[in-house]
């Protein structure tokens, strides 16, 4: 049973439970286990040979950097979902909500899309300072990240060796800045 910390629409609180509920709803709608649905609907069409989800769709996914870049390309230029769904996923929902980005602090507002954080005006932030406010992505406790800037189609992934901590907080912004500079030939 899931306990709500706040009423929906009151405050943005990241929760694995929301992703797990979405996974359960997808299983009920399709009659297929979430891992099989992801394999057949995402992994196989995109050629993600290394992607494994053994357990919760909220935190048990594993893939190599090459496959994550293929997935990031899909997020930048969707082929598996409708343009309308892609636009909704990348759009801010409940734009006025205050919330916390784990490891980075409280933000007013704290924009999120459907399952992905949207950079907005957050500062400091784990993506590149020079990426657009529309940049969206996700990072996890495994110390890895994936982001896409839909305005420039720039994207990056990082596969970490150790759990998220102060090192990641201190280095991801500068690392992503260097990545963007390299993509722009600067």
State what each model feature region is.
Residues 1-15, 32:
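Active-site-proximal loop and beta-strand segments within enzyme catalytic domains
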Residues 15-18, 64:
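Helix N-cap/beta->alpha junction signal
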Residues 21, 46, 50:
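Conserved N-terminal glycine/acidic-rich loop preference
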Residues 10-11, 27-32, 36-44, 54-186:
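Catalytic loop of the DD-peptidase/beta-lactamase superfamily, centered on the K-T-G motif
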Residues 17-24, 70:
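Short amphipathic alpha-helical face segments that pack within enzyme cores
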Residues 1-4, 23, 73:
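Amphipathic, well-packed alpha-helical segments that form the structural scaffold of globular domains
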Residues 5-8, 49-55:
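Glycine- and aromatic-rich loop/turn segments at beta-sheet edges
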């Amino acid at each position: 049973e899931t306990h709500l910390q706040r009423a929906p629409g009151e405050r943005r609180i990241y929760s694995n439970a929301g992703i797990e509920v979405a996974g359960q709803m997808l299983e009920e709608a399709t009659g297929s286990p979430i891992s099989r649905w992801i394999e057949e609907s995402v992994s196989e069409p995109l050629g993600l040979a290394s992607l494994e989800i053994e357990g919760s769709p909220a935190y048990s996914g594993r893939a190599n950097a090459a496959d994550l870049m293929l997935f990031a390309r899909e997020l930048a230029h969707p082929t598996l979902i409708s343009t309308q769904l892609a636009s909704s996923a990348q759009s801010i929902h409940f734009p006025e909500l205050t919330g916390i980005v784990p490891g980075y602090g409280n933000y007013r507002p704290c924009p999120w899309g459907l399952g992905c954080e949207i950079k907005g005006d957050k500062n400091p932030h784990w993506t590149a300072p020079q990426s657009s406010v529309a940049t969206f992505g996700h990072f996890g406790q495994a110390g890895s990240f994936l982001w896409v800037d839909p305005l420039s189609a720039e994207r990056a992934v990082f596969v970490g060796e150790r759990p998220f901590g102060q090192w990641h907080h201190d280095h991801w912004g500068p690392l992503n800045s260097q990545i963007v500079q390299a993509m722009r030939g600067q």
